[in-house]
């Protein structure tokens, strides 16, 4: 059956499109070891394994031509592993791989009609006893000598 060229291209394009967390060359999902997402100077991102295959020596300088736009990126002295990570893709992969570190909330639900007057226990550490600083007394010499000391002061 013949299909319109635009529709076929659209269906084919959607079938071949990689997700944001996949390398568009090898279609492998980015990971935290071999397939780290590395960014070229042009801004396109590919996995580290594919970048190493694209590394080509030319005139004693190593260059990586971008498979999408053909802009060449010089390879740093440490090799492909020294290229910048695509931070957004890296953090997305890291978030998928690591278990959630959020502490579970208490299983006791708050009633809507309950008035909250204190912080829930365990949210903030207690500071312990607070230091007591002596408060100076006050003397005024205007209409006569008027002195007072704060309550609990031993000078009274």
UniProtKB/Swiss-Prot annotation:
It comes from the Eukaryota. CDD domains: RING-HC_RNF224 (cd16565). GO terms for molecular function: zinc ion binding. Keywords: Metal-binding, Zinc, Zinc-finger. Disulfide bonds: none annotated. A zinc finger (RING-type) spans 23-70. This is RING finger protein 224. It comes from Mus musculus (Mouse).
